[in-house]
Amino acid sequence: MMKLAEIQAACGVLCVDLAAVVDNYQTLARHVAPAQCGAVLKANGYGLGAEAIAPALYAANCRIFFVAQLSEGVALRNILSADAMVVLLNGVMPQAMPFCCAQQITPLLNSVDQVMTWLALQEARSQRRPVLIQLDSGMSRLGVTPEQLARLAAIFRQRGWAAPDYIISHLANADRPDHALNVYQHTLLQQAKKAFPTSRYSLANSCGMFLHPAWREDLCRPGVALFGVAQPWFSTPLKPAFTLTLTILRVQDVPVGTPIGYGSTVTTTRPLRIATVSAGYADGIPRNLRPPAGVCWRGVRLPVLGRVCMDSFMVDASAIMPTSGDVVEFIGVSQTLEEVAAACDTIPYEIMARLGARFRRIMQPAEA
């Protein structure tokens, strides 16, 4: 009888090195000190498995965790100690705020109405929850405007509140160090300090942590950097923290003129050896995956042929002699996450966030 792990591995194996995640966190925390270093684990920890990653980071003294949705917050709250703050970046609707209080989950307040509702709710409680407000300094996504934040200062004074615990904003171009908007957004955050001089402030995401030290403020929020995703200009090396391997389902030699895949977008112009691989776009393999990306067999690159299917895709294995059941690397040493993303005209974030539930996930312990 097959074990569940063997059944799941039939699609592919996603191996997460928790020791590397922890090492990256500690490296980043040292880099931004004395600022506090949190951890962004939205989208199931960027597709890798937040419920295993969060406790490992907590053991490494991370005490503030960011997710996007309420369901993600509940999942983390259930496994983290009470002294860990769980913050919802998307905030919540007013009707969900009492539930957040009961669950010790902190929504990031993204409008004046949300701030007013949250303050009123806390004033009726014996134990007040933290107040975190998002400032829209240049994303035009979520948060109060600078003008609204200035008006909120008067409201706080009228209601007897000193200040929000945190005012948080988000850089729109942190991956472009010389972009003028970075300076503009930082300037708006400095102006916010006139209204709330005693609040703590947060601006830097993964890339923002490697801009000028002033951008680090009181709290930094690394996300993909925890998993080794870095820009070439980062001053501190990070460790890749996961690999994804797939399985060859079939190997077939085909003659000239053989159509391959949906839409027959590729027709062979020479005899080829085609290998069919065990995952597809239902598992997060981008449908628009293009050569030179594909898979790697013992370090040899096998480029994709034709369109990725829902549950499989084909590669050119003419240079080797693989067999059905062989394990091939999709993300790892021989084909990096960044190379896969570039071949799909996207970013590493998207590739990670789309990693599917059908993969077997192996968590290598941080103690190893």
UniProtKB/Swiss-Prot annotation:
Catalytic residues in the record: 42 (proton acceptor), 262 (proton acceptor)
Molecular function as annotated in GO: alanine racemase activity; pyridoxal phosphate binding
One of the GO BP terms on file: D-alanine biosynthetic process
Annotated catalysed reactions: L-alanine = D-alanine
GO cellular component, one term: cytosol
Pfam families xref list: Ala_racemase_C (PF00842), Ala_racemase_N (PF01168)
Cofactor(s) the protein requires to work: pyridoxal 5'-phosphate
InterPro entries attached to this UniProt entry: Ala_racemase (IPR000821), Ala_racemase/Decarboxylase_C (IPR009006), Ala_racemase_C (IPR011079), Ala_racemase_N (IPR001608), Ala_racemase_pyridoxalP-BS (IPR020622), PLP-binding_barrel (IPR029066)
Pathway assigned to this chain's UniProt record: Amino-acid biosynthesis; D-alanine biosynthesis; D-alanine from L-alanine: step 1/1
Record key words, sorted: Isomerase, Pyridoxal phosphate
SUPFAM superfamilies: Alanine racemase C-terminal domain-like (SSF50621), PLP-binding barrel (SSF51419)
Binding site for substrate: 141, 310
Claim: Iron is one of the keywords in the record: no
Cystine residue pairs: none
Known EC number: 5.1.1.1
Modified residues (N6-(pyridoxal phosphate)lysine): 42
Keyword Isomerase appears in the UniProt entry: yes
Family: Belongs to the alanine racemase family.
Function: Catalyzes the interconversion of L-alanine and D-alanine. May also act on other amino acids.
Protein name listed in UniProt: Alanine racemase 3
Organism listed in the record: Salmonella typhi
